[in-house]
Structures are given as C-alpha cells and as structure tokens.
C-alpha cells in the first residue's frame, strides 16, 4: 500500500495524466468527430460536471457515480453519463424553443464502477442527442452519423468496426405480455449478457414462452439480410409487430444513407440503460472486448423533467476509440534553436509556410538540440542562418543551408 505522502502527489485511482503523443491524438480525434457533428448541423452544449443526485434516476448509474455534498447538505454527483444532463438541459433551458433539438457534446464523465473494466474512472464521451422527434428517420440518421464519425476518426466499417442494432421494445414487450412476473429478471440478465441466467429462468416458463425467451436473443445476422426479421415474426403476435415495423423502417433508411453494410442485427440487444424504449445499438471494434460507442431511443426520459419529448442519441468513448485506431505517423515538427531576432524571424517565416515550429531560445549545441528533439517527437532540428535555415533531420548527417520555402517543403514533404 502506498504511503500517504506518496498518494498525495499521485493521480487518484482510476485516473491518469495523458501525455503527448497520446493527448495530441485524443484531441485530434475529438476535433474530427465534432467536425462531423457540425457538418450535420448539431450544436454543441456544455453541462456542469456536478448534478443534483435527483437528476439521475437509474439506480445503476447512481450507484456508479462519485458522490459529494454541497454546503446545504444536498447530495451531488459527478455526471456518470451525458444523456440525462442533456435531457435536463432541454427541459430547463429550451422549453420555449421549437423542437427538434439537435445537440452535441464532448465532455468528461465519471464512474466508479468502470475502474478495472476497460475504462478509467474519468473518460471522455463525444455524442449527439436528437430531442423532440419520434421519427425512425432520426434513429437511422444518428446511426449513419455515428458510422460517419468513426470513419472520420480513422476506422473502416466492417473490417474495423460493426454497429450491432437491436430493438429494446421487442424483447421487453414479448416478456411483459407473456411472463410479466419473470420479465424483470430476464431483462436484467440479458442486459448483462448473462445467457446462462436467461436459460435458467426460461426453464421455469411454459414451452411456448420459453421458446421466445431463449430464441429472441439468438436472432442475430446481417442487417442487409431479411432473415432475422422474418424469423422474429414468430414472436410478434399480440403486440410485437410495431417494434419490428419500426426496425424495418430504420433499416430501409439506413440503406438510403448507404450504411446498411456496417450494421448487424441482434434482437437480444436491449441496452445497458433502463431508459431505452426502441432502437438500441452498440459499436464493437476489432481487437477490443468493450464497446466503443452505444446509443438508442429513450422516449420517456424527458417526462421526468416535465417535457414529454421523444429522443434518440449516442455516445462515443474517445479513449477506447483512440486505442483501436491504426498507428499514425507523427505530424512533422521542427525544433528551431536560437535566441536572437534572426531566430524569431525564421520561426515566424517557417510557421507562415505551415511548418509547426518549436522555438527554443538558447545556445543548444547540435547534439543537445537533437536529444531535445527526440524527447518531443520532432523529426527536424534547425538553426537560423543568413538567407534561410540550417536544417537537419534527426538521426541523419550534416545540415543543409536552405531558403525558408525550401526548408518548409523538406519538412512537410
């Protein structure tokens, strides 16, 4: 166990400092993802890190949250996710504006329960929420945007990642119609992907009901193939048809978006959150045992805040996304050494040509400058010279005396 003195100057459990080049990559991916959101007209919002505990209703989320008390002894939570704070924001700040509201964000969230489960206690989510429309077109549109954002970050659909799409209302509706007394336990087991428990609970049911309880979670296949939905019709009598028709409409529109090949159907997917009411989806990436993103429709959540508006959206875990991206060659960086006016002018001129320049004022010898350049992942070292720059690639031979324009072409090329 670490001493109190050692703990005092270290990061807290589940958190870490992020250094270059990882921090640079994380911010670059965030920029690309937000750029796709903006291209689709989504407007960014920022909510407080602290919310009153009453804002978060779902027990699992409240249990996972970091808790503290304000001077009035009111319990506060560090936000464990972003959907509920945005639902509160819409009901509180946008109640007089016309829907739909298309909002985006990229903010840190905090969860105690995630420590040791593939996620830090503090991690960054980037996502969108569409509030005020029940149209399946918005479900399809957000899924298509999710695929587009992941592509912009550097993943390729199919080979690098797959969107797994389900319909929370279909399985839940089947259970509530057929075996309401066992439905909560079955839904809890399926949400936790505990198929052994699903099988155990199914044995207590009449054969026809047990067949659906076991069979629906096994309905998995490509979204471009109609076999899954055809098989699902066996379990749709008595009220499940509307959920399947909703799913068909979403798939048709995903085809119009050109994103159907990136989607796999799984009718056993009901989502991790209690508030999902319709289409629900998760994104899995090659080489990672955890989801990179998840989302779905939550038509009842805003009722808690006095605004009965339907909604849908998704969140991307940026740290997980960065962890599965292919390696990238670092951006070119030039360490320019010199403390006189000539060095300042050379740095300005190079930056004017688009060259990233780290200017070090001082008298570093070439060997010292190269060692420093390696420490900051720079590929080039330079010194100001009459008419241009003396330039050397790290680890290579002597210097070239080049005009600023030629030096810029060499560094950027």
From Swiss-Prot:
Family: Belongs to the class-II aminoacyl-tRNA synthetase family. HisZ subfamily.
Other information: This function is generally fulfilled by the C-terminal part of HisG, which is missing in some bacteria such as this one.
Record localization: Cytoplasm
Coiled-coil boundaries: none
GO molecular-function terms, A-Z: histidine-tRNA ligase activity
Region (Disordered): 1-21
NCBIfam families the UniProt entry points to: hisZ_biosyn_reg
Keyword Cytoplasm in annotation: yes
Origin species: Rubrobacter xylanophilus (strain DSM 9941 / JCM 11954 / NBRC 16129 / PRD-1)
InterPro entries: aa-tRNA-synth_II, aa-tRNA-synth_II/BPL/LPL, HisRS-like_core, HisRS/HisZ, HisZ
Gene3D superfamilies to which the protein is assigned, alphabetical: Bira Bifunctional Protein, Domain 2
Subunit comment: Heteromultimer composed of HisG and HisZ subunits.
Role summary: Required for the first step of histidine biosynthesis. May allow the feedback regulation of ATP phosphoribosyltransferase activity by histidine.
Pathway stated in the Swiss-Prot or TrEMBL entry: Amino-acid biosynthesis; L-histidine biosynthesis; L-histidine from 5-phospho-alpha-D-ribose 1-diphosphate: step 1/9
GO BP, one annotated term: histidyl-tRNA aminoacylation
Pfam families: tRNA-synt_His
Record key words, sorted: Amino-acid biosynthesis, Cytoplasm, Histidine biosynthesis
A GO cellular-component term linked to this record: cytoplasm
Source taxonomy: Bacteria, Bacillati, Actinomycetota, Rubrobacteria, Rubrobacterales
The protein's name in its UniProt record: ATP phosphoribosyltransferase regulatory subunit
């Amino acid at each position: 166990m670490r001493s109190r003195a050692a703990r005092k100057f270290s990061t807290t459990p589940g958190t870490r400092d992020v250094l270059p080049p990882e921090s640079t990559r994380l911010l670059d991916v965030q920029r690309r993802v937000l750029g796709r959101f903006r291209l689709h007209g989504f407007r960014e919002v920022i909510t407080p890190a602290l919310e009153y505990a009453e804002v978060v209703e779902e027990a699992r989320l409240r249990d996972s949250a970091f808790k503290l008390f304000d001077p009035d002894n009111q319990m506060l939570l560090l936000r464990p996710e972003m959907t509920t704070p945005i639902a509160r924001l819409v009901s509180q700040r946008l109640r007089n504006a016309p829907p739909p509201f298309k909002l985006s964000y990229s903010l840190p969230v905090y969860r105690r329960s995630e420590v040791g489960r593939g996620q830090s206690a503090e991690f960054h989510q980037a996502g969108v929420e569409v509030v005020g429309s029940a149209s399946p077109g918005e479900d399809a549109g957000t899924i298509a945007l999710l695929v587009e954002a992941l592509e912009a970050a550097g993943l390729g659909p199919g080979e690098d990642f797959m969107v797994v799409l389900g319909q929370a209302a279909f399985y839940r509706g089947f259970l509530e119609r057929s075996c309401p007394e066992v439905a909560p336990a079955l839904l809890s087991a399926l949400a936790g992907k505990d198929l052994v428990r699903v099988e155990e609970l199914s044995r207590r049911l009449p054969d026809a009901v047990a067949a659906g309880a076991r069979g629906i979670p096994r309905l998995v296949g490509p979204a471009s193939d109609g076999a899954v939905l055809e098989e699902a019709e066996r379990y749709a009598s008595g009220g499940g048809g509307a959920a399947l028709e909703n799913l068909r409409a979403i798939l048709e529109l995903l085809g119009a978006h050109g994103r159907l090949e990136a989607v796999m159907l799984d009718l056993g997917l009901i989502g991790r959150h209690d508030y999902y009411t319709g289409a629900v989806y998760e994104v899995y990436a090659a080489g990672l045992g955890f989801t990179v993103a998840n989302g779905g429709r939550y038509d009842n959540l805003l009722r808690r805040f006095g605004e009965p508006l339907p909604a849908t959206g998704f969140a991307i875990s940026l740290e997980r996304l960065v962890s599965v991206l292919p390696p990238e060659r670092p951006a070119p960086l030039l360490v320019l050494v010199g403390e006189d006016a000539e060095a300042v002018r050379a740095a300005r001129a190079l930056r004017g040509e688009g060259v990233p320049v780290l200017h070090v004022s001082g008298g570093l010898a070439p060997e010292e400058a190269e060692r420093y350049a390696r420490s900051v992942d720079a590929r080039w070292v330079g010194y100001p010279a009459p008419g241009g720059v003396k330039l050397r690639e790290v680890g290579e031979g002597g210097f070239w005396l080049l005009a600023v324009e030629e030096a810029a072409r060499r560094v950027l090329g």
